[in-house]
Amino acid sequence: MKTIGFIGLGLIGGSIAKAIRKYHEDYRLLAYDQDRETLAAAVSSNMIDAVCEEHDERFRSCDYIFLCAPVEFNVKYLEYFKDNIGPDTILTDVGSVKGIIHKEVERLRMESRFIGGHPMAGSEKTGFEASSDRLIENAYYITVSYTHLRAHETEADL
């Protein structure tokens, strides 16, 4: 059984989590979001299994962690996760720009644990309530990784 963590359950994070839940009911899904109402809705709909705090030990158990907050927040989470995730955990983001986050990945020497991602999907609506397991269905998911390192080997799993 895989464990997948989410930082942010807005339109994209919520849609990815809903799609994973739909196709992999046995996966364990953990999530943190600044909006407590979003987390309550995710739990009540059985989309996530556990609500996490921003800096939560349970993220150590994740096989993958999706950074689905705004880019500037995703960059900040890298610093925390550098020393607070399992040795084989892969981090990925869904931000539309990669320069800032890739510079931070390199500065923190996390290249073997990070795959930049960008789902080519969206909506004029925002937030968890607009998310759907169908939003990313048949959408391209662009990945950008460091080809000489371990993260590249796991892209196919995503």
Model-derived segments and their meaning:
Residues E57-K82:
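Rossmann-like NAD(P)-binding element
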Residues Y80-E129:
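Rossmann-like NAD(P)(H) cofactor-binding subdomain of soluble oxidoreductases
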Residues A69, G95, S145:
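Glycine-rich, N-terminal phosphate-binding loop of Rossmann-like dinucleotide-binding domains
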Residues D133-I142:
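Acidic/polar active-site rim loop that often engages polyanionic ligands
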Residues M1-E54:
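NAD(P)+-binding Rossmann beta1-loop-alpha1 motif at the extreme N-terminus of oxidoreductases
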Residues T147-T154:
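Conserved small/polar residues in nucleotide/adenosyl-binding loops
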Residues I4, I65, L91:
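Receiver (REC) domain switch-region micro-motif
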